[in-house]
Amino acid sequence: MSPKSSGILKGHFLMAIPGLPDPNFAQTVTCICEHNKTGALGFIINRIHPLLTGQELFEDLKITCNQAIDKIAIHLGGPVQPSGVFVLHGPPFDWHGCLKINDWLGLSNTRDILEAVARQEGPENFIVLLGCAGWGPLQLDNEINDNAWLTIPVSQEILFKTDVKLKWEMTMMQMGIVSDNHSDNSGKA
């Protein structure tokens, strides 16, 4: 049973279809962390804050940080709770309130993981995000049925290792879609 037909997209990427008119999500890759009858929660993983540095973020949070943390990118996770700070990360998963998404991916947003990341003592693989994306009951299911999104299982390589500018293109290529050969129109067969 596919995620589309079962309604369970936790642990999947959502890729905006080529030509999606919503500027909040055009050419985005979103990691879905929760999807159930009450709605869905996800994080855009291919948009970087143009001005905010890691050091500035942690100083704003009054968290002491290692100077090298300034080199990490701060991702724009979505238009909901834009000042909320979240961490998508690999093991360990023993942070307060960690939501384990699959065997190798968790979501946390408590001070313990933020302090560990700031000191470079946290998980080996992580991305720091501001804000999230949210959908109400059946909203995401309806958008998928209306062909606004494509889905594939989350990939460690794309999430943690691929250049942010290439993530949308790489996920589309995994589906066999080459960005030069697509239509900006969607529909149903």
Curated annotation (Swiss-Prot):
Assigned protein family: Belongs to the UPF0301 (AlgH) family.
GO terms under cellular component: cytosol
Protein name: UPF0301 protein HRM2_24640
InterPro entries, alphabetized: AlgH-like
Pfam families: DUF179 (PF02622)
Naturally occurring in which organism (per UniProt): Desulforapulum autotrophicum (strain ATCC 43914 / DSM 3382 / VKM B-1955 / HRM2) (Desulfobacterium autotrophicum)
